[in-house]
Amino acid sequence: DKYSSLEFWNDFSGKEKIRFLYILYSFYEIMKNKLPNFLVVGAAKSGTSSLHEYLIQHEDIFMPTINKEGKSVKEPQFLIKSKVEERLHFGIWNWDEYKFLFENVKQEKAIGESTVFYLYYYKEAIKNIKLRLGNDVKIIILLRNPVDRAFSAFQHVSKSVKESLSFEDALNQENGRLEQDLTLTPMVMYKDMGLYYDMVKAYKEEFDNVHVILYEDFRDKSDKVLKGVFEFLEVNIKTKINSSTRHNV
């Protein structure tokens, strides 16, 4: 009855009540707003940029392209804000700004975003995915041979962020490197980002729908892989995608 319900509520501490109301509000936001029902979480330098660009072409899929200021955006980073905000010069750090990314959703069935560090910072990402987006989000993971992935990441950092070490020295000095320099991009964890087992295991344990793609399959049989992705997202598998261009590999 209403009295026992009131007594039950009064058994909670103040902090517990606040947390309960916050979770309730978060689920209300999920229902009210057009928010992602799938995420491309990584790994970095494993074909995620190409997949993102191909998904944008599908009429049943919405991926954000601009932020509130009209600037181009691909990787919001929002769900791992506490891990990367100090290190990265790009990202969406505010909940209202994150929601704005999806304001132009119309009739698209699949709504998603791509942030490659969601795989590496899987504990933080999973916690916030569940809190902000719910438990039914579909997860897409691309994996590449760890050695090839590491060297590709090194080349990327050397070109865009000016890596100060040789590849060999960077591998030897990797332990503790992020802690020693708070301005470094997480991309410099060349070896650590290729230790996929715990990352993938955690996502598979926490979410019912996880789709894993091998980079080599995506590179060599992109049409077949894309069809598998479309089936996973439950969108039209016959849509023609221009997959001739490879992006940022």
Regions found by a protein language model. Give the residues of each.
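Hydrophobic/aromatic beta-strand patches that form the interior of the parallel beta-sheet core
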Residues: 112, 138-140, 211-213
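The conserved 3'-phosphoadenosine-5'-phosphosulfate
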Residues: 70, 74, 201-249
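Canonical radical SAM enzyme core domain
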Residues: 144-147, 218-220
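Glycine/proline-rich, positively charged
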Residues: 170-173, 194, 198-201
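Alpha-helical packing segments of well-folded alpha/beta enzyme cores
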Residues: 98-101, 125, 196-200, 225
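PAPS-dependent sulfotransferase catalytic core
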Residues: 1-121, 132-137, 146-180
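Active-site rim elements
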Residues: 82-87, 115-116, 185-194, 214-216
